[in-house]
Curated annotation (Swiss-Prot):
Main location: membrane
Protein species of origin: Lactiplantibacillus plantarum (strain ATCC BAA-793 / NCIMB 8826 / WCFS1)
NCBIfam families the record matches: PRK13661.1
TM ranges: 12-32, 45-65, 76-96, 112-132, 151-171
Protein name as it appears in the record: UPF0397 protein lp_0150
Topology class, membrane: Multi-pass membrane protein
Record key words, sorted: Cell membrane, Membrane, Transmembrane, Transmembrane helix
Length: 186
């Protein structure tokens, strides 16, 4: 019971702090791409780390809340199709936690290659398939506009995660003690 309660507290705290960090990164550290309403999102690199440490619930909720707050502050109201897709991408990144196991302090090349292939596929599904289709169905946006935005966002977010996310994952894994690496002194 104690472990389950401490895990839920940890998840709530990670969600709150993660949402705040994602909001700040989306609001102040995004790099415009030249295509309207798209940017290179540094927050996605952080999201990869958040998901790998805290799992799907914390990552999904943190990016959902952070993105919704950013849209509300920036545009006056959230663009729900993209906010929801970001939340789903956060969940997907969190599902990689058990495969990456960065808490063990070992994050080899094979795991990094797997994760980057995985995140490119996840970003493709989210930004090229789901978000633009949602924009067309819900907001009646022109298909050529939203699919262009989706493709640009897929490329930008995939690059952000591949560079920033990979660096953060490697640096974090290096701070963890490898299992079985400590020996008792006599």
């Amino acid at each position: 019971m104690q472990n389950k309660q401490s895990n839920s507290i940890r998840t709530v705290v990670a969600t709150g702090i993660g949402a705040a960090v994602i909001f700040v990164l989306m609001k102040f550290v995004a790099i415009p791409t030249g295509v309207p309403n798209t940017q290179v999102n540094v927050a996605m690199g952080f999201l990869a780390l958040l998901g790998a440490i805290f799992g799907p619930v914390a990552a999904g909720l943190a990016v959902f809340i952070g993105h919704a707050l950013n849209d509300f502050v920036t545009y006056g109201s959230p663009w729900w199709t993209w906010v929801i897709v970001d939340g789903l991408i956060g969940v997907a990144f969190g599902l990689a936690k058990n495969r990456l196991k960065i808490e063990n302090g070992v994050l080899g090349t094979a795991k990094l290659v797997w994760f980057n292939i995985y995140q490119i596929i996840v970003n493709f599904i989210g930004w090229v398939l789901l978000a633009p289709t949602g924009d067309i169905i819900i907001y009646h946006e022109p298909a050529n506009k939203v699919y262009l935005q989706g493709v640009i966002t897929w490329i930008a977010d995939s690059i952000s995660v591949a560079i920033i996310g990979t660096i953060l994952l490697v640096l974090y894994a290096r701070t963890r003690t490898q299992r079985g690496s400590l020996t008792k002194e006599r």
